[in-house]
Amino acid sequence: MFSSHASLPIHSRRLAAGLDSRWQQPQIQAIAGSQAIVPTVVEQSGRGERAFDIYSRLLRERIVFLGTGVDDAVADSIVAQLLFLEAEDPEKDIQLYINSPGGSVTAGMAIYDTMQQVAPDVATICFGLAASMGAFLLSGGAQGKRMALPSARIMIHQPLGGAQGQAVDIEIQAREILYHKSTLNDLLAQHTGQPLEKIEVDTDRDFFMSPEEAKAYGLIDQVLTRPTMAITDHNDAVLQ
């Protein structure tokens, strides 16, 4: 039995409060790339300065991001990170943050299968949007550790696809889409506890949910709220 709300995961709280005693307070710079601005964290240590892109820095805290559509390149990157973190510590949880409109079913299933196979629990956290394959991966997190931020949106639907060519080619592609539809619906029923018949009806069209609705549906277990902040006598913010 889980409460409707929970504070942010421990790694996020540690980063927010600056509690990593191994490093001095990092300086943050931004580097403009062709697609987006990727911040670089410059950390001071006894051995001098070291620079990390923000995602590599968060990977050290066992935090992985899925912040784009799902394709083979994205799947390869996330699978590699999950396997690396398992090799580093097979008992410590991994956090997978999801803000994704979905994408390739086969690429998404590669991520999903790896999530189920690695030894550590993979906690999933939705921020922004988890739609289509993004919502499926959100539901595939470790039981009790599937979460969403309060303003997130979650959407499930059936696989989409198209085909052209001779009639037999179209028939082959149609069978493949129906196979993926059946597989995804079966797994969604397993992860949510909903009857398969309800999953089939709800995924027939785009089915949007708020975090609270997704929790009631069984897609997630907790809705995250902002940690309570207290101000110390020295005006330093600390987490309660």
From Swiss-Prot:
Gene3D superfamilies the UniProt entry points to: 2-enoyl-CoA Hydratase, Chain A, domain 1
Molecular function (Gene Ontology), one example: ATP-dependent peptidase activity
Catalytic activity: Hydrolysis of proteins to small peptides in the presence of ATP and magnesium. alpha-casein is the usual test substrate. In the absence of ATP, only oligopeptides shorter than five residues are hydrolyzed (such as succinyl-Leu-Tyr-|-NHMec, and Leu-Tyr-Leu-|-Tyr-Trp, in which cleavage of the -Tyr-|-Leu- and -Tyr-|-Trp bonds also occurs)
Gene Ontology annotations of biological process type: protein quality control for misfolded or incompletely synthesized proteins
Keywords assigned by UniProt, alphabetized: Cytoplasm, Hydrolase, Protease, Serine protease
Enzyme class: hydrolase
One Pfam short name: CLP_protease
Subcellular location: Cytoplasm
Highest taxon listed in the record's lineage: Bacteria
Family, similarity comment: Belongs to the peptidase S14 family.
NCBIfam families xref list: clpP, PRK00277.1, PRK12553.1
Protein name, per record: ATP-dependent Clp protease proteolytic subunit 2
Gene: clpP2
